[in-house]
From Swiss-Prot:
Enzyme category, top tier: hydrolase
Gene expressing this chain: uppP
Stated role: Catalyzes the dephosphorylation of undecaprenyl diphosphate (UPP). Confers resistance to bacitracin.
InterPro entries: UppP
UniProtKB keywords: Antibiotic resistance, Cell inner membrane, Cell membrane, Cell shape, Cell wall biogenesis/degradation, Hydrolase, Membrane, Peptidoglycan synthesis, Transmembrane, Transmembrane helix
Protein name: Undecaprenyl-diphosphatase
Catalytic activity: di-trans,octa-cis-undecaprenyl diphosphate + H2O = di-trans,octa-cis-undecaprenyl phosphate + phosphate + H(+)
Primary location: membrane
Topology relative to the membrane: Multi-pass membrane protein
E.C. number: 3.6.1.27
């Protein structure tokens, strides 16, 4: 196989991983680095030649999130059209502003450090280490939260701009391959007073501008990349698989967090600890 191309089976596997791990708190970037290495695939999934594939995966994931949260966005934008000074309009403006504030740290820190961090820690063994640490962080969070009364807070509008900025800083941990973006932001939101369901909803709403921005940025770079024959068709299939997987993952997780308040992140934490440790051992041999 040409190491510059991706087979359809490889594309489907990576697309399923992207669609699931982008939302589950287990790190999509970490899995994208570790899984090809474990399977002995020759390609670099983050190489320039695979930009079309990454663009389409992110596009599929973004569409899935927009479809699932269409009612949330519709309520926000309908609220913006309300009467000047109405409570609904003020709440809609506040939620949009929260999302903007929460995105700013990733834009600044990502612009300054993302490429450096991924160049420094972008190997599969580093990803396995950070995946292990991601699991410990999830487990530690649930242990700390178990000592507190059950949170009743669900309303995203109850967050302050300082809360949003702090959650945005948590998101920046995900520039390290193996640290989950959704996991980090859910943890940040939990510590700012939301319950698991509210934290997950805010995390997934935050993800949409970030993923769309990444898609646009990668699409602009794609103009200068020579795409091997047939790879655009493979990328399109990957996008559809990622979209379906992301939609199913989002629906499952929102229902899961609605029904589980205590220790909700623990199963994902145990998975990350085990997967990180096993991957590190295998890759070391």
């Amino acid at each position: 196989m040409d190491s510059r191309t991706m087979t359809l089976i490889q594309a489907i596997v990576i697309a399923i991983l992207q669609g699931a791990t982008e939302l589950f708190p287990v790190s999509s970037l970490g899995h994208a680095v570790i899984v090809p290495a474990l399977l002995g695939w020759a390609f670099d999934p983050h190489g320039e030649i695979f930009l079309p594939f990454l663009v389409m995966l992110h596009l599929g994931t973004a569409i899935a999130l927009l479809v699932y949260f269409r009612n949330d966005w519709a309520a926000i934008f309908q609220g913006l059209r309300g009467r000047d000074g109405s409570q609904r309009q003020a709440e809609s403006i506040h939620i949009l502003a929260l999302l903007v504030v929460a995105t700013i740290p990733a834009v600044i820190i990502g612009g300054l450090l993302e490429h450096w961090l991924r160049a420094l820690f972008g190997t599969a063994r580093y990803a396995a280490i950070f995946l292990f640490l991601n699991g410990l962080l999830l487990l530690l969070t649930e242990r700390m939260k178990s000592r507190q009364p059950v949170q009743g807070g669900y309303a995203i509008a109850s967050l302050t701009y300082a809360d949003a900025a702090i959650i945005g800083l948590w998101q920046c941990l995900a520039f390290l391959p193996g640290i989950s973006r959704s996991g980090a932001t859910i943890i940040g939101a939990l510590f700012r007073g939301l319950n698991h369901e509210g934290a997950a909803r805010f995390s997934f709403l935050m993800a949409q501008p970030v993923i769309i921005a990444a898609t646009v940025r990668e699409a602009l770079h794609m103009r200068h990349v020579a795409i091997p024959p047939g790879q655009m068709q493979v990328a399109t299939i990957g996008a559809m698989v990622a979209a379906v997987t992301a939609l199913a993952s989002t629906a499952f997780l929102m229902r899961y967090f609605h029904n589980h308040e205590r220790w909700a992140l623990s199963p994902f934490g145990y998975y990350c600890v085990l997967a990180g440790a096993v991957s590190f051992f295998i890759l070391g041999h």
